Structure formats: C-alpha cells, structure tokens
C-alpha cells in the first residue's frame, strides 16, 4: 500500500502454530517481499475453518510445523512481484487455496477446477521456488494451503489470488474463500441441481447450509437437511430447507436411508455429504434414487478412512462423486459469486456467529467446536 514498504520486508503480527495440538502463538513475523509471479497482501479478515483445526490437531498427514495456518482471507494487494499481471497494487482480493493457472493439463481440460501447477510445493508449505516468505525468531515458518491468512500480511502465488468488487466488505468476502463457496458451488456447479429436484444435505454447518442456498436458488422441490443437532433445523429453514430430519430420533428400525427414500418417493436426485464421516457418506449414496441419483462428497474424511458400499448400489445407476471448492474456478468464477452476494442473491453475513480479534484467535477455535458456531471471523487489523 505504501511505497515505503514495497520491495522491503514487513514485520507484522501473525498467529503461529509452532507445533501440533498446541494453541496458536501471536508473534512478530517478518514477511519478505514478493518474488516473480508472487503477490503480497495486507489481510483484514479471515475465517476460521475446520480444515485449520484438522491440521493443527496433528492428524493431517500433510501437516508440517511451524506454520501460519488460515485459508479463508481477504485484503488489499500491498505489492506485486515481477511478471504479475492479474492483480495490481490496491486491488481488493481473496486468497485462493485452489489456484487457477489456465495453462496446466487440469486447467486446459475444462473438466475440473483443480490446478496442478503448484500442487507439489503448496503441499509442502513453501512457495513455488521451494522457500518460505515468513520468518520468526530466526526460524523459517511454513505457508499453509498457499494462503496463510492468520497473518496481517501474506505472500501468495499470482495464480492463487483474485481481484473482487471493492464494495464487498472484507469480513464477508473472506468467507467466500472457502466454506460458503464450497457448498454453493457443489449445488450449482458440481451437481448442477435443477428445478424440481429432491435433495438431501447431510451436515448443517457453513458448507451444508450453503449447499441449501444453492439448491434453493435452483428451485429444488424438496431440500431436506439431515443433522444430529436439532438447533440446525432453524438454520436450515433460514437458508431454504423444506424439511429437517434428526437421524438419532427416528423410530426404532427406521434408518435415515429408509426415511429419505420414503420422503422422496424412491430416493433423492442429489445428496450431499458435508460431514467428512464415511458412514454418513454411505448413507448419502444409498438414499439416492435408483437409476439416476447422484451423491456428492464434500466433507473431508480423516486420514486413512475409506468409503464402502455394495457395488449393486452403483450398478443400478447411482453415482458417487466429489467436489473441492465446490467445483468453482477461483480466478474466473469467484468474482461472479462475490457479485451474487452484493446483489443480494447469496447470504453471507448471516453465517458470522462469532467475531474475535487476532489476539483471541484461540478463542475462535474454541467457539468453532461449540455447537452454536457457524463461522467465526477474526479481525486482523
């Protein structure tokens, strides 16, 4: 932002995860200037996501420490490296954990939103040149998911950032960097739900509720939210669900699959798993209509978990598929989703149930694990 910082290291506050299963520590970190095809962003707000907690817990096989977590952030471009043409200093931006280079086999296929260009280095917590831009107390600090939004400044690859309408406030825009877009896109892009479809959504967190939004926008006939917490019924109704089922309160001998097949005259056209529970994933598939029902897996299961069903479920016409970031291409499609929010077509602010300053980010993690939190937003300013 200021010419006095361009090309120079910046010292700022960040929440550093020094080791697994320990609280984050607020530290002074040094953020190096961006190199070729890199962008340095002054971040204003970040969401706290279950993926961050999963890595912090130590069970993530790709987790490495020390690291600056966070992948749901929005801010302003402070400076750019040589060769950057897609954003400029002063642009309002969202960091992208799913990049879009437009040149790799994945991007050119037109069949996926996945991009292979920097996957190898991103998974190791470093920039494309194999090094980090963060240091603290003389130690190199790793990046996370190509974003590291738990810092007042971050450096990302130019293919991992997108300029958005500056009318979108950062505390809302940041949530479109993961949770809301993941669910909304799964309904509108991956599944491509159509008017009159019957759908069931397993899991009433921010992703599941955003699936409901997308299905409602498309004119689905029945949108059934399935959750073991009765508190989620009201949330579902707010976003467009037409029914709610708590599988723990069904009559003895009645399974959730039985119930959904009964409610939808033979099964759902689409089901969505937003839980990461492999048992739920099986139920979601088997609640699909014979001949054409499709189940979309969105929730990320714990390491080592496997899905199973009887092959006959697939032979008789059901489809199992998955979605990352809702099938949304970050650089080419996310700005349009931001505009949908600004036009009042997509609810975002309603999902913010808790707010904390950076100094209290550990409290935001505690709130996330509580039943009444949909999304906690951390103010980085």
Curated annotation (Swiss-Prot):
The lineage of its organism: Eukaryota, Fungi, Dikarya, Ascomycota, Saccharomycotina. Its cofactor is Zn(2+). Zn(2+) 2 binds at residues 101, 104, 107, 115. It comes from the Eukaryota. Zn(2+) 1 binds at residues 49, 71-72, 178. It is an enzyme of class 1 (oxidoreductase). Belongs to the zinc-containing alcohol dehydrogenase family. Class-III subfamily. It comes from Candida maltosa. One of its GO terms (cellular component) is cytosol. This is S-(hydroxymethyl)glutathione dehydrogenase. Binds 2 Zn(2+) ions per subunit. Its EC number is 1.1.1.284, 1.1.1.1, 1.1.1.-. It catalyses: a primary alcohol + NAD(+) = an aldehyde + NADH + H(+); a secondary alcohol + NAD(+) = a ketone + NADH + H(+); S-(hydroxymethyl)glutathione + NADP(+) = S-formylglutathione + NADPH + H(+); S-(hydroxymethyl)glutathione + NAD(+) = S-formylglutathione + NADH + H(+). NAD(+) binds at residues 50, 203-208, 227, 298-300. NCBIfam families: adh_III_F_hyde. Keywords: Metal-binding, NAD, Oxidoreductase, Zinc. Pfam families: ADH_N, ADH_zinc_N.
């Amino acid at each position: 932002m200021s010419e006095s910082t361009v090309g120079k290291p910046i010292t700022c506050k960040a929440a550093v995860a020094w080791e697994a299963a320990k609280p984050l520590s607020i530290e002074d970190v040094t953020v190096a200037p961006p190199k070729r095809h890199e962008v340095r962003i002054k971040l204003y707000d970040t969401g706290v996501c279950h993926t961050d907690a999963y890595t912090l817990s130590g069970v993530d096989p790709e987790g490495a420490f020390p690291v600056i977590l966070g992948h749901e952030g929005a801010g302003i471009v402070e400076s750019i490296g040589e060769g950057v043409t897609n954003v400029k200093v002063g642009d309002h931006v969202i960091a992208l954990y799913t990049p879009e280079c437009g040149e790799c086999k994945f991007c050119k296929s037109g069949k996926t939103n996945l991009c292979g260009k920097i996957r190898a280095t991103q998974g190791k917590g470093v920039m494309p040149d194999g090094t980090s831009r963060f240091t603290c107390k003389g130690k190199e600090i790793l990046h996370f998911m190509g974003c590291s939004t738990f810092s007042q400044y971050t450096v990302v690859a130019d293919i991992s950032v997108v300029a958005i309408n500056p009318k979108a406030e950062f505390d809302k825009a940041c949530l479109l960097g993961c949770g809301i877009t993941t669910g909304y896109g799964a309904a509108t892009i991956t599944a491509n739900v159509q008017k009159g479809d019957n759908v069931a959504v397993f899991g009433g967190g921010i992703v599941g509720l955003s699936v409901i939004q997308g299905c409602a926008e498309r004119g689905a006939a029945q949108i059934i939210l399935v959750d073991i917490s009765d508190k989620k019924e009201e949330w579902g109704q707010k976003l467009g669900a037409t029914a709610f089922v708590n599988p723990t309160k069904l009559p003895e001998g009645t399974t959730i699959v039985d119930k959904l097949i009964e409610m939808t005259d033979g099964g759902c056209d689409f089901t969505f798993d937003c839980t990461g529970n492999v048992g739920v994933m099986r139920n979601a598939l088997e609640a699909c209509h014979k001949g054409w029902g499709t189940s979309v897996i969105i929730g990320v299961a714990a390491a080592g978990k496997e899905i199973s069903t009887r092959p006959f479920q697939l032979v008789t016409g059901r489809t199992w598929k998955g979605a990352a970031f809702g099938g949304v291409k970050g650089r080419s499609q996310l700005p349009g989703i931001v505009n949908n929010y600004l036009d009042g077509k997509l609810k975002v602010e309603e999902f913010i149930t808790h707010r904390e300053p950076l100094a209290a980010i550990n409290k935001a993690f505690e709130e996330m694990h509580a039943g009444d939190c949909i999304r906690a937003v951390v103010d980085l300013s």
